[in-house]
Amino acid sequence: MIITSAEQIRNLTGSYYANNDFKKIESILQSVEDEISDIIGHNMMAQLAAESEGGQSINPKAVRSCQQAVAFMATMRFYRLNDISHENSGRKVKIDKENEARPFEWQLARDDRAHLEEYYRALDRLMRALEDDPRFQETDNWKRKSVLIVKDADSLSYLTGVEPSPWLYVRMIPYLVDSQRFVEKAYGSALSGITGDDELEHAAQMAVALGAIALMGRRSSLQTLPYGLMKIFESNGGGNTQEAASIDQLNDYLKYLSKEQHYWLNEMKNLRDEAAGTEKATHLQMPENDKQNKFMRL
């Protein structure tokens, strides 16, 4: 494991008691580590864990960032499980009524949000530290990005308006691949041959990026969406709380993204036709008023 003691968690988060029993949080740490391994690769995670235990690291920034990400997510889950005491006689809440008070729901939500923000910031630092690491560049997920027309997190941010997040970009690689395949089929040819035309390339990037976000929103539950996308799907609940967007709001937003994608697909085709000297297709919206041809077809 990349974290092996309660004292490490304390140093990484600043909020965990170093004298807590490490075994109580060990299984949570392992599950979070496994989730991150699914993205960066299990071999890469094993190497980072070995470097952490050995004290000598080829990429110390990556080790530290990975430890912080695991620590913040694990402690958030640990705190959620321990808000209520689980005993033989049932679930109880133990509070010193003179000196303690139960937090409000909005306070718990704010604390969860703070942990999530630190978790995703640590993941972003991890991905930046791994971008130039040849060991990470050998992972299957990283190799898939070589065929993409949206090359990195900065490009994704510029095209869609989401916060620049290397972790979000890596999470979206499978959706970007599927979206690019759809765009290539609709366009009629591979997108690798359009890099010389700036306008056409931009239209293709817009279509791929918007389609990828729509795919991720449809295929993922709100709880599993990366924080960068969750901030898009949230609506202000007023007061000290923020409520998640309703299903109707989410569906409306996904429909809007799909319409935007089709707009940029049509723009790609128009630019291709202009370059080839082909006139744009025109569609008759209303029939011509012909005095000699007055009839209605049912």
Feature-to-residue mapping (PLM):
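Conserved short "hinge" loops at termini or chain/domain junctions
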Residues: M1-Q68, R77-A209, L215-L298
